[in-house]
From Swiss-Prot:
One of its GO terms (biological process) is axon guidance. PROSITE patterns: FN3, IG_LIKE. Disulfide bonds join C63-C118, C162-C213, C268-C316, C358-C408, C452-C501, C543-C592. Retina and developing brain. This is Neuronal cell adhesion molecule. It comes from Gallus gallus (Chicken). One of its GO terms (molecular function) is cell-cell adhesion mediator activity.
Length: 1284
C-alpha cells in the first residue's frame, strides 16, 4: 500500500519527472519525452491584467507558452483580431508570442492603449491569456496657483491642502521644507491619507514660509513640488482651549467599501486643544488580532488581508480633557472572484474517465462560464465524451480526438478569473526515467531514498524487488512513495545491494536496477580536551577519527566558529592542532570538523590562557623625549620631519612614533601618523589637503614610551577635491514605504577643503530607472519616502567640497523597508515519530509574499489535553525557530499520549506573518512515570498492607502494576524474588503469608501497553506478635520487646531551660539523644547527646517566651524516634533574685486558696445531691473572673514562675500520652470551660432553668482553660481548678 510522504528539498529537481496522472499539471519535462509526446499549449508567462507602462519606453506585452508541437501565437485588440504585420511599430519575438511596440520613432504610447489578449494554438488545442489592459502612466504638472499666506491664531486648527495632479498611478505624497528635510509630524501635526497636512492646533513654532508638498510618480521616477505655503501664527493671551472636532471625515457617519484581500485604511483626524487622542473600536466585535495596525499616531486604522468577516461598524473617538466626539464608518467587504478549486490539467489514456472542476467564490457570487480552445463551449464543436454540469465538465470514455484546452471564467462586478486546463489523451507504455544502475550512497542508521521516476498512460503501477530476481519488497521497514521512490527509513549495512523497480500498465512493463551502498558513519574517537595554558607555552588539541575506508575525510579546524588566524604559530597535523607560543588572543573555542561526501561530525574544546608565574626583572627607565623637531622640504602632499633623540636610559630605543594634530578640524587631539626604527631621526610624511599640521615624536624602548616631544611648527596644506567617498554605505528601510540611506561621514582632515557635502543617489534595481540625487551636508543619513515595499535599490554616496567632487563612488545594493509577511505556510503536515518526537513539514511561502529578508519559520505548538486524563490545563505555547528556507523541523520533548496543536508562521526582519490553520496531532502511548508514592502500613505477624498512588504522568492507559519483593537478612543479602501483577484500578494490597519478624524490600512500577515505567522501592518489616508481647531472651530468662519504643515524652519548661523526660521499652544500654528546634521554623534540628541511659535531660540556653518542638531518639536502633512534642518557655522576668516558692506568705496564701476551693466544692456537691437549683448569679459570684482575683498577673508575684517539680506534678493527671502546653492553653475539644460549654455555641451545657450542669463534675481526662487567649501564665484559682 502506497504511503504519502514529503520529499526533501535536495530531491526537488526530481519532482518534474514524477508522473501524477489524474492531478498532473504537465507531462514530465524530460527532453526525450517532449520530442515524442504531444501536448496542448500552456500559457507560462503573461503581462498583468492592469498593465501601466512608461510612455518613454517601448511597450513589451508578454505572452509565453509551451506545447508539443510548439504553439503559434495570435493577438486580439479591443476584441478584434490584431494584425501585427500591418503595423510597422509592432513586432513579435521569435519563438514567442511577446509583442514589442517601438515608440522611439515619435509614436505616442497613448495610441496603443487598449485591451489585448493572446492565443497560443497547436494541433491539440488553444490556450488564451487574460485580458491585458494597456495604459501609459501619466505624471501631469502641478497647476499654477497663487497661494495666500495663512494667518492663524494660536490654538486654532489648520489644514494645508496639497491637491496633487491626478496621475496614473496616483502619486505618493510627502511634505518637506526647502532644505529637503521631512517636516516633523506628531499627534498634533500629521499628514492625512489624501495628502493634506492637518494641525489639530497650531503653536508659535509652526510659523514658517516653506511648507512644501511633494508628489512622487514612481513609474516615471519624477518628483514634483507645490508652491511653498506660508503659515504665520499670532498669539493671543490667554489661549482658549477647545473640545475635539473632527476635521476628517465630516459628519457622524460614513461608508467604506473594500475588496477582500486588500488593505483597509480608515482615518480620523480631529482638532482641539489640548491635542485630542484617537481611539478605535469595532462595534459588536473585536479588532482582528495580528492583522490590525495603528498608524499616523493612531489616527489611521489599518487592517491587512481583509475578509467578509471584517465588515461592520468601526468607531473612532477623539477625546481631550474638555470632551469627546466620534465618527462611525460602516465598512462593507466585497470580493472579486477567488479560487476554491481551479481546474487542473488532465492526462488520460483512451477509454478513461475524468473531470474538470472549476469552483470560485466572491461577493457577489461569481458566475462560471466555460470555453474550449478559446471559444464559448455552447458554440464549440460537439464532443460526445464531454458533458457540462455547471462548474464541472465530465469526460467519459475519452478518445484521442478529445484532447483540447478548456478555459474557465469566473466573474462578478469586481473582477474575473481565467484558468486554462488541458485534457491530453495519450496511450503510452511505461517508461522509467531514472538512469539505469544509478548508485546511491548513504550513512548507516540514516534514511535511504531510491528513485524510480516514471511515465506512462494509463498511470503505471510500481513494484520494488531486492536484487534482480528477488522477492517483492513489503513490510513496515519500507515506505513506498506515490512518485515511485522507495524509502528505507533506517538503512543498515546489510541494506547494501541491488534494487529493481518494475513499472507496468496495460500497454506493457519495464524495469530498472539501481545500486545502494551503506557506509559506516564518521566518528571522532578521541576528541579535543579543555586546556589551561600559560602564556608563551604550547597548546595541543587532538582529533582522532574513524571513518568508512571508502570515504575520504577532510579535517577543518575553527577558532570561535571562524577560520584559524593566518599565523605560522598554528600547526595543523593529521589528527591534531598545535599552537606555539600562545598569547592572550588565542583564548577561545577550537572546533574540529570532519567532513566526508556523506556526513559531517565535529567536536570542540576551550583554550584558556593564563599569566605565567612572575619572574624577577631588571628595572630600566623609559627614554627621554626627542628634541629639536624641524620641518623641511615642504610640498603640497608631503614634508620631511627631523629630530634629535633623547637619552636612552640604559635601554636602546627600538622605534619612534610620530603623531600629528589637525589644528583646523580637531585642535588638541593627537593622531597616530607613522613610526620608524630607532636608528632613524628623519622621516618623509604624507600629507592631506586642507589640514593645519603640527607633529610630535615619542621614543620607545623595551621599558615603554617616552613623554611626547614638544610640538613642531604648524604647516597648512592647500585645499583639493576629496580623495575618498564615505564608507559603510547602506540602504535599509525603517518603514515599509521608505529607504534609509546611511554612511560614515568623512573626518575633517578627509574633506580636503571647505564646504564638505554628500551627493546621495539611488535608483530601483532591475527597472532601468534614472538616478535620483540630492545633496546634503552635516548629516550621515537620508530617508527616501514613498518606496515600494522591500525592493532592491542601487545606492551611491559621493563626497564633494567647494573645489569639486571625489572620484565616482562604487554602488551598493540596499532594500526598502520590510513589511510583515502576507501568507501563512500551507500544507502543514505532522508525522509522529514516537511518543515524544514529531516531525512537521510545510510548504514554503512564495518569496514575494515574504516582503522582506526571509529569516525562517516559527512553529508554535502546545498541548491541548492528555488523552488519559481528559482534562484541559493551562496552555503553555512553545516556539521553535527554523532558520532559512527550511520546510521541515523536529518537535522534541512531547508528552506521550497527548493531543497537541501547532501552527507555522514565516518570519522576516519585520516580524511574523499570519499563522497557518492549527494542525492537531496526537502522540502515542509511552511508558508511565513511577507511581507517585508507595506506603507500607499495618505490619502484622505475616502480612503487610501496601498503598500507592497512580503515576503523575501515566503517558497512556495503565494496564497493570508490577510488584516485586524479596526478604533481606541482617547482612543485607537478598532472598528469592516474588513478582505479582496487580490490576490498574487497584490502589492497595494486603500481602499475606509473609515470614514474621522479617525485613522485605519492595519494587513497584506501573505498565502501559508500551511497557513498564521506572520503579520505586521501599522496605518494611513484619512484627513478631501483634500485641507487642515481650519474648524471652535465649538462655537468660529476660524478656525484651520486639521493637524498642520511646513514648510519653513530657516537658516542664522554665524561662531559659526545660526538663525533658520519657519512657523507654527495649534492649538495655540504649544511647539516647534529644533533638529540638523553634516551632514552625525550617531550620535543621539541634541535637544533644544524653549521657548514659537516663530517661530525662535538661535543655539549657533557651529563649524566653518561645515555642519549641522536641523529639527523643536512640542511637544504633535503626534510627527510630518518638513523635514530636511542643512546649513554650516562660516570659522574661525583671528580677529573679527571690525564690517566691520558698516565701512563707506565699505558702500560706496558697493553702488558704486551696481550702476555700475545697469548701466551695463540698457545698456545691451537697446542693447538687439535694437536687436544688443553682442560680446563675450565685454561680458567677462563686466562680469569680480570674482577671479580678487579688493575685493579678501584673503584680509580679504569681503565674510567672513555676518550679520544675510543680510543673511535672501538674502533668500527672493528664490523659496518657498527652500534655498541656506550659501556657495552659487547651484546644476546644479538650476543655470543659470553653465558651461553647457555657452556652455560646450549640453544645452549651445548660439546664432549662439556666443552672450549670456538671460544672464541678471534674472530668479528669481534661483540663479547664482560661477564659481569654492570653499567652500569660494563669491565675492561682485556675491553677487549683486544674489540680482538683
Amino acid at each position: 500500500m502506497m504511503k504519502e510522504k514529503s520529499i526533501s528539498a535536495s530531491k526537488a529537481s526530481l519532482v518534474f519527472f514524477l508522473c501524477q496522472m489524474i492531478s498532473a499539471l504537465d507531462v514530465p519535462l524530460d527532453s526525450k519525452l517532449l520530442e515524442e509526446l504531444s501536448q496542448p499549449p500552456t500559457i507560462t508567462q503573461q503581462s498583468p491584467k492592469d498593465y501601466i507602462v512608461d510612455p518613454r519606453e517601448n511597450i513589451v506585452i508578454q505572452c509565453e507558452a509551451k506545447g508539443k508541437p510548439p504553439p503559434s501565437f495570435s493577438w486580439t485588440r479591443n476584441g478584434t483580431h490584431f494584425d501585427i504585420d500591418k503595423d510597422a511599430q509592432v513586432t513579435m519575438k521569435p519563438n514567442s508570442g511577446t509583442l514589442v511596440v517601438n515608440i522611439m520613432n515619435g509614436v505616442k504610447a497613448e495610441a496603443y492603449e487598449g485591451v489585448y489578449q493572446c492565443t497560443a494554438r497547436n494541433e491539440r488545442g488553444a490556450a488564451i491569456s487574460n485580458n491585458i489592459v494597456i495604459r501609459p502612466s501619466r505624471s501631469p504638472l502641478w497647476t499654477k496657483e497663487k497661494l495666500e499666506p495663512n494667518h492663524v491664531r494660536e490654538g486654532d486648527s489648520l489644514v494645508l491642502n496639497c491637491r496633487p495632479p491626478v496621475g496614473l498611478p496616483p502619486p505618493i505624497i510627502f511634505w518637506m521644507d526647502n532644505a529637503f528635510q521631512r517636516l516633523p509630524q506628531s499627534e498634533r501635526v500629521s499628514q492625512g491619507l489624501n495628502g493634506d497636512l492637518y494641525f489639530s492646533n497650531v503653536q508659535p513654532e509652526d510659523t514658517r514660509v516653506d511648507y512644501i508638498c511633494y508628489a512622487r510618480f514612481n513609474h516615471t521616477q519624477t518628483i514634483q513640488q507645490k508652491q511653498p505655503i506660508s503659515v504665520k501664527v499670532f498669539s493671543t493671551k490667554p489661549v482658549t482651549e477647545r473640545p475635539p472636532v473632527l476635521l476628517t471625515p465630516m459628519g457622524s457617519t460614513s461608508n467604506k467599501v473594500e475588496l477582500r484581500g486588500n488593505v483597509l485604511l480608515l482615518e480620523c483626524i480631529a482638532a482641539g486643544l489640548p491635542t485630542p487622542v484617537i481611539r478605535w473600536i469595532k462595534e459588536g466585535g473585536e479588532l482582528p488580532a495580528n492583522r490590525t495596525f495603528f498608524e499616523n499616531f493612531k489616527k489611521t486604522l489599518k487592517i491587512i488581508d481583509v475578509s467578509e468577516a471584517d465588515s461592520g461598524n468601526y468607531k473612532c473617538t477623539a477625546r481631550n480633557t474638555l470632551g469627546s466626539t466620534h465618527h462611525v464608518i460602516s465598512v462593507t467587504v466585497k470580493a472579486a472572484p477567488y479560487w476554491i478549486t481551479a481546474p487542473r490539467n488532465l492526462v488520460l489514456s483512451p477509454g478513461e474517465d475524468g473531470t474538470l472542476i472549476c469552483r470560485a467564490n466572491g461577493n457577489p457570487k461569481p458566475s462560471i462560464s466555460w470555453l474550449t480552445n478559446g471559444v464559448p463551449i455552447a458554440i464549440a464543436p460537439e464532443d460526445p465524451s464531454r458533458k457540462v454540469d455547471g462548474d464541472t465538465i465530465i469526460f467519459s470514455a475519452v478518445q484521442e480526438r478529445s484532447s483540447a484546452v478548456y478555459q474557465c471564467n469566473a466573474s462578478n462586478e469586481y473582477g474575473y478569473l481565467l484558468a486554462n486546463a488541458f485534457v491530453n489523451v495519450l496511450a503510452e507504455p511505461p517508461r522509467i526515467l531514472t538512469p539505469a544502475n544509478k548508485l546511491y550512497q548513504v550513512i548507516a542508521d540514516s534514511p535511504a531514498l531510491i528513485d524510480c521516476a516514471y511515465f506512462g498512460s494509463p498511470k503505471p503501477e510500481i513494484e520494488w524487488f531486492r536484487g534482480v530476481k528477488g522477492s517483492i519488497l513489503r513490510g513496515n521497514e519500507y515506505v513506498f512513495h506515490d512518485n515511485g521512490t522507495l524509502e528505507i527509513p533506517v538503512a543498515q549495512k546489510d541494506s547494501t545491494g541491488t534494487y529493481t523497480c518494475v513499472a507496468r500498465n496495460k500497454l506493457g512493463k519495464t524495469q530498472n536496477e539501481v545500486q545502494l551502498e551503506v557506509k559506516d558513519p564518521t566518528m571522532i574517537i578521541k576528541q579535543p580536551q579543555y586546556k589551561v595554558i600559560q602564556r608563551s607555552a604550547q597548546a595541543s588539541f587532538e582529533c582522532v577519527i574513524k571513518h568508512d575506508p571508502t570515504l575520504i575525510p577532510t579535517v577543518i579546524w575553527l577558532k570561535d566558529n571562524n577560520e584559524l588566524p593566518d599565523d605560522e604559530r598554528f600547526l595543523v597535523g593529521k589528527d591534531n592542532l598545535t599552537i606555539m607560543n600562545v598569547t592572550d588572543k588565542d583564548d577561545g573555542t577550537y572546533t574540529c570538523i570532519v567532513n566526508t561526501t556523506l556526513d559531517s561530525v565535529s567536536a570542540s574544546a576551550v583554550l584558556t590562557v593564563v599569566a605565567a608565574p612572575p619572574t624577577p626583572a631588571i628595572i630600566y627607565a623609559r627614554p627621554n623625549p626627542p628634541l629639536d623637531l624641524e620641518l623641511t622640504g615642504q610640498l603640497e602632499r608631503s614634508i620631511e620631519l627631523s629630530w634629535v633623540p633623547g637619552e636612552e636610559n640604559n635601554s636602546p630605543i627600538t622605534n619612534f612614533v610620530i603623531e600629528y594634530e589637525d589644528g583646523l578640524h580637531e585642535p588638541g587631539v593627537w593622531h597616530y601618523q607613522t613610526e620608524v626604527p630607532g636608528s632613524h631621526t628623519t622621516v618623509q610624511l604624507k600629507l592631506s589637503p586642507y589640514v593645519n599640521y603640527s607633529f610630535r615624536v615619542i621614543a620607545v624602548n623595551e621599558i615603554g614610551r617616552s613623554q611626547p616631544s614638544e610640538p613642531s611648527e604648524q604647516y597648512l596644506t592647500k585645499s583639493a577635491n576629496p580623495d575618498e567617498n564615505p564608507s559603510n554605505v547602506q540602504g535599509i528601510g525603517s518603514e515599509p514605504d521608505n529607504l534609509v540611506i546611511t554612511w560614515e561621514s568623512l573626518k575633517g582632515f578627509q574633506s580636503n577643503g571647505p564646504g564638505l557635502q554628500y551627493k546621495v543617489s539611488w535608483r530601483q534595481k532591475d527597472v532601468d530607472d534614472e538616478w535620483t540625487s540630492v545633496v546634503v551636508a552635516n548629516v550621515s543619513k537620508y530617508i527616501v519616502s514613498g518606496t515600494p515595499t522591500f525592493v532592491p535599490y542601487e545606492i551611491k554616496v559621493q563626497a564633494l567640497n567647494d573645489l569639486g567632487y571625489a572620484p565616482e563612488p562604487s554602488e551598493v545594493i540596499g532594500h526598502s523597508g520590510e513589511d510583515l509577511p502576507m501568507v501563512a505556510p500551507g500544507n502543514v503536515q505532522v508525522h509522529v515519530i514516537n511518543s515524544t518526537l514529531a516531525k512537521v513539514h510545510w510548504d514554503p511561502v512564495p518569496l514575494k509574499s515574504v516582503r522582506g529578508h526571509l529569516q525562517g519559520y516559527k512553529v508554535y505548538y502546545w498541548k491541548v489535553q492528555s488523552l488519559s486524563r481528559r482534562s484541559k490545563r493551562h496552555v503553555e505555547k512553545k516556539i521553535l525557530t527554523f532558520r532559512g528556507n527550511k520546510t521541515f523541523g523536529m518537535l522534541p520533548g512531547l508528552e506521550p499520549y497527548s493531543s497537541y496543536k501547532l501552527n507555522v508562521r514565516v518570519v522576516n526582519g519585520k516580524g511574523e506573518g499570519p499563522a497557518s490553520p492549527d494542525k492537531v496531532f496526537k502522540t502515542p502511548e509511552g511508558v508511565p512515570s513511577p507511581p507517585s508514592f508507595l506506603k507500607i502500613t499495618n505490619p502484622t505477624l505475616d502480612s503487610l498492607t501496601l498503598e500507592w498512588g497512580s503515576p503523575t504522568h501515566p503517558n497512556g492507559v495503565l494496564t497493570s502494576y508490577i510488584l516485586k519483593f524479596q526478604p533481606i537478612n541482617n547482612t543485607h543479602e537478598l532472598g528469592p524474588l516474588v513478582e505479582i501483577r496487580i490490576p490498574a484500578n487497584e490502589s492497595s494490597l494486603i500481602l499475606k503469608n509473609l515470614n514474621y519478624s522479617t525485613r522485605y524490600k519492595f519494587y513497584f512500577n506501573a505498565q502501559t501497553s508500551v511497557g513498564s515505567g521506572s520503579q520505586i522501592t521501599e522496605e518494611a518489616v513484619t512484627i513478631m506478635d501483634e500485641a507487642g508481647i515481650l519474648r524471652p531472651a535465649v538462655g537468660a530468662g529476660k524478656v525484651q520487646p520486639l521493637y524498642p519504643r520511646i513514648r510519653n515524652v513530657t516537658t516542664a519548661a522554665a524561662e531559659t531551660y526545660a526538663n525533658i523526660s520519657w519512657e523507654y521499652e527495649g534492649p538495655d544500654h540504649a544511647n539516647f539523644y534529644v533533638e529540638y528546634g523553634v516551632a514552625g521554623s525550617k531550620e535543621d534540628w539541634k541535637k544533644e547527646i544524653v549521657n548514659g541511659s537516663r530517661s530525662f535531660f535538661v535543655l539549657k540556653g533557651l529563649t524566653p517566651g518561645t515555642a519549641y518542638k522536641v523529639r527523643v531518639g536512640a542511637e544504633g536502633l535503626s534510627g527510630f524516634r518518638s513523635s514530636e512534642d511542643l512546649f513554650e518557655t516562660g516570659p522574661a522576668m525583671a528580677s529573679r533574685q527571690v525564690d517566691i516558692a520558698t516565701q512563707g506568705w506565699f505558702i500560706g496564701l496558697m493553702c488558704a486558696v486551696a481550702l476555700l476551693i475545697l469548701i466551695l466544692l463540698i457545698v456545691c456537691f451537697i446542693r447538687r445531691n439535694k437536687g436544688g437549683k443553682y442560680p446563675v448569679k450565685e454561680k458567677e459570684d462563686a466562680h469569680a473572673d480570674p482577671e479580678i482575683q487579688p493575685m493579678k498577673e501584673d503584680d509580679g508575684t504569681f503565674g510567672e514562675y513555676r518550679s520544675l517539680e510543680s510543673d511535672a506534678e501538674d502533668h500527672k493527671p493528664l490523659k496518657k500520652g498527652s500534655r498541656t502546653p506550659s501556657d495552659r492553653t487547651v484546644k476546644k475539644e479538650d476543655s470543659d470551660d470553653s465558651l461553647v460549654d457555657y452556652g455560646e455555641g450549640v453544645n452549651g451545657q445548660f439546664n432549662e432553668d439556666g443552672s450549670f450542669i456538671g460544672q464541678y463534675s471534674g472530668k479528669k481526662e481534661k483540663e479547664p482553660a482560661e477564659g481569654n487567649e492570653s499567652s500569660e501564665a494563669p491565675s492561682p484559682v485556675n491553677a487549683m481548678n486544674s489540680f482538683v
